[in-house]
Curated annotation (Swiss-Prot):
Pathway: Cell wall biogenesis; peptidoglycan biosynthesis
InterPro entries hit by this protein: Lipid_II_synth_MurT, Mur-like_cat_sf, Mur_ligase_cen, MurT_C
MF (Gene Ontology): acid-amino acid ligase activity; ATP binding; carbon-nitrogen ligase activity on lipid II; zinc ion binding
Species of origin: Staphylococcus aureus (strain COL)
KW Ligase (keyword) present: yes
Enzyme Commission code: 6.3.5.13
Catalytic activity field: beta-D-GlcNAc-(1->4)-Mur2Ac(oyl-L-Ala-gamma-D-Glu-L-Lys-D-Ala-D-Ala)-di-trans,octa-cis-undecaprenyl diphosphate + L-glutamine + ATP + H2O = beta-D-GlcNAc-(1->4)-Mur2Ac(oyl-L-Ala-D-isoglutaminyl-L-Lys-D-Ala-D-Ala)-di-trans,octa-cis-undecaprenyl diphosphate + L-glutamate + ADP + phosphate + H(+); beta-D-GlcNAc-(1->4)-Mur2Ac(oyl-L-Ala-gamma-D-Glu-L-Lys-D-Ala-D-Ala)-di-trans,octa-cis-undecaprenyl diphosphate + ATP = beta-D-GlcNAc-(1->4)-Mur2Ac(oyl-L-Ala-gamma-D-O-P-Glu-L-Lys-D-Ala-D-Ala)-di-trans,octa-cis-undecaprenyl diphosphate + ADP; beta-D-GlcNAc-(1->4)-Mur2Ac(oyl-L-Ala-gamma-D-O-P-Glu-L-Lys-D-Ala-D-Ala)-di-trans,octa-cis-undecaprenyl diphosphate + NH4(+) = beta-D-GlcNAc-(1->4)-Mur2Ac(oyl-L-Ala-D-isoglutaminyl-L-Lys-D-Ala-D-Ala)-di-trans,octa-cis-undecaprenyl diphosphate + phosphate + H(+)
Protein name as it appears in the record: Lipid II isoglutaminyl synthase (glutamine-hydrolyzing) subunit MurT
Family under the similarity heading: Belongs to the MurCDEF family. MurT subfamily.
Length: 437
């Protein structure tokens, strides 16, 4: 009776929330969890395979690629594709999407929510994308966070799918007897190098890791004299092109994708790894990968007549560097709109922008840079310190700032942080209404 009441109240809450113009992703789960504290555990027990996707960057793209590919092959799933990746949002997804025929759940999970959610749900597999500095006022230092995750997931029989090229992710191998590695061959692609490194110290002994090849930041082929090393990958990208969309060679199979950004190659590979471990073959994966387009502000493309735009979320130095690199891959003039909010969900500490490589903008052909959000003036200062000699316009209203980019001929590169994403994406959809997206 308690479970029935929880589910029905949650569904009513969803309808009410949407009726007043909200998404209704967290509220149903919050209400259900108060009525029945075991609701998530009960619903999860009805599913055969539960896949958790976590990491600092790339969770949403990886999760959506997996979800889209399964649906493209007529496989029913539970999927929190609206991005609500904490306990309440995950509970909402199970309540709204569970059916007797649904036997797979694809769940994006916030790194900080892993200890709480794993008290209620044990996934059959977890894939980790990467670990970078991100809102450390929420989680503490990366080493502490990774150690906490390892302790939480240990001895639970979870199959771990790990990015072999990230030593932070690879160290999670201590938490399971069943490990599958994915990675990228040396020289598969020439990533832009950054001066930002998370840590290149061995998690076993503390010595400086030796790198045979670096893709970017701490991502690459590494080893230590104590024996810790980059493991051999079962699933591997041998080469790829990006112009600006990805053309991947994974395990000698080609994938012509509709997502941009070289950093998304790792996200596609993480998704591929999950799908292969779920039993899909190359052709079924190709059916999904080659029909996937972003509609959630992650490398999302817009076009109307001669005006083009692309938006990509950036909430830490690595994400910002990746977004700024997109502009370098685009020919001709650009206009940037960059937003920085410091709301609770963003993390109050915005000092990470000083670790991002804004200096690279000085090499691009830029008509103007519009800075917006609650910390617009701090962005303006950061750009001045980077000696970016283009007009820098401050417009704190995100809607107005985004709309203003339509006054310029150049390609709009829109870079919001977390709570800036919804208003910036909404305005781009308005501005490009009737066009291509």
């Amino acid at each position: 009776m308690r479970q029935w009441t929880a589910i029905h109240l949650a569904k009513l809450a969803r309808k009410a929330s949407r009726a007043v113009g909200k998404r209704g992703t967290d509220l149903p789960g919050q209400i259900a969890r108060k009525v029945d504290t075991d609701i998530l555990r009960k619903l999860a027990e009805q599913v055969d395979d539960i896949v958790f996707i976590s990491g600092t960057n790339g969770k949403t793209t990886t999760s959506n690629l997996i979800g889209h590919t399964l649906k493209a092959n007529n496989i029913q799933i539970i999927h929190n594709n609206e991005g609500a990746n904490m306990a309440a949002g995950i509970t909402s997804a199970f309540i709204m999407q569970s059916t007797p025929k649904t036997k797979i759940a694809v769940i994006e999970i916030d790194e900080g929510s892993i200890p709480r959610v794993l008290k209620e749900v044990t996934p059959s597999m977890m894939v980790f994308t990467n670990f970078f500095r991100d809102q450390m006022d929420r989680f503490g230092e990366i080493d502490i966070m990774v150690n906490n995750i390892a302790e939480t997931i240990s001895n639970k029989g979870i199959k771990l799918l790990l990015n072999a090229d990230d030593p932070f992710v690879s160290r999670l191998k201590i938490a399971s007897d069943t490990i599958v590695y994915y990675g990228m061959k040396a020289h598969a692609h020439e990533f832009e190098q950054s001066t930002m490194n998370e840590s290149r110290y061995c998690p076993n002994c503390g010595r400086l890791l030796q790198y045979d090849y670096i893709h970017y930041n701490q991502i690459g082929h590494y080893h230590c004299q104590c024996g810790f090393k980059r493991e051999q990958a079962k699933y591997e990208i041998s080469s790829f092109d990006v112009a600006p969309f990805l053309y991947l060679n994974i395990n000698d199979e080609k994938y012509d994708m509709k997502i941009a950004g070289d950093f998304n190659a790792y996200n596609a590979l993480a998704a591929y790894t999950v799908l292969r471990e779920l039993g899909l073959n190359e052709q079924t994966i190709k059916n999904g990968f080659e029909t996937y387009t972003s509609d959630n502000g992650r490398m999302q493309y817009f076009k109307k007549e001669r005006k083009e735009a692309m938006i990509n979320l950036a909430k830490n130095p690595a994400g910002m560097n990746a977004s700024l690199s997109v502009g370098e891959q685009l020919e001709g003039e650009k206009v940037y709109v960059i937003s920085l909010n410091d709301n609770a969900a963003d993390g109050r500490d915005t000092s990470w922008i000083y670790d991002a490589d804004f200096e690279k903008l000085s090499k691009q052909q830029i008509e103007a840079i519009i800075v917006t959000g609650t910390r617009a003036e701090e962005l303006q200062l950061r750009l001045k310190l980077a000696e970016v000699e283009v007009p820098i316009i401050v417009e704190r209203d995100i809607y107005k700032a985004t709309a203003k980019t339509m006054d310029y001929k150049g390609f709009t590169v829109a870079i919001p942080n977390y709570t800036s994403l919804a208003p910036m994406l909404e305005q781009l959809n308005r501005s490009f209404e009737g066009g291509q997206s």
